[in-house]
From Swiss-Prot:
Single GO molecular function: iron chaperone activity
InterPro entries: CyaY, Frataxin/CyaY, Frataxin/CyaY_sf
Aminoacyl-tRNA synthetase as UniProt keyword: no
Organism the protein comes from: Chloroherpeton thalassium (strain ATCC 35110 / GB-78)
GO-annotated biological processes: intracellular iron ion homeostasis; iron-sulfur cluster assembly
Record protein name field: Iron-sulfur cluster assembly protein CyaY
Cystines in this chain: none
Source taxon at top rank: Bacteria
PANTHER family from the UniProt entry: FRATAXIN, FRATAXIN, MITOCHONDRIAL
Cited PROSITE patterns: FRATAXIN_2
GO CC aspect terms: cytoplasm
């Protein structure tokens, strides 16, 4: 992929996460977006931030204790630490926090 294609894919991924959160219509989750960022907040105030890092062509995911950097590999965003796939990992974090299954795919 070219740099331009990667940047487009970065934006499309964030838009897709936003669309899927919006479609869930879950009272226990709230989210806000701004240019290159999706901020997800649970009922108890815990925040998860998914952000575009254009300079490094990465997506970063942060939660109160940890943070992960995701690189594009074979059309998927894979974390550089534990090889987590972005959507599955975000689903797992939110599901664990809320105590119920969350699906973003």
């Amino acid at each position: 992929m070219t740099e331009k294609e990667i940047r487009i894919f970065l934006d499309e991924t964030l838009e897709d996460i936003q669309d899927k959160l919006d479609a869930m219509d879950d009272d226990e989750l709230d989210f806000e977006t701004s240019d290159g960022l999706v901020s997800i907040e649970t009922e108890d105030g815990t925040k998860y931030i998914v952000s575009r890092q254009s300079a490094t062509n990465q997506i970063w995911l942060a939660e109160p204790i940890n943070g992960w950097k995701f690189n594009l590999q074979d059309g998927k965003w894979i974390s550089d630490k534990e090889n987590h796939e972005l959507y599955s990992f975000l689903e797992a974090l939110l599901s664990q926090k809320l105590g119920k299954p969350i699906r973003l795919k």
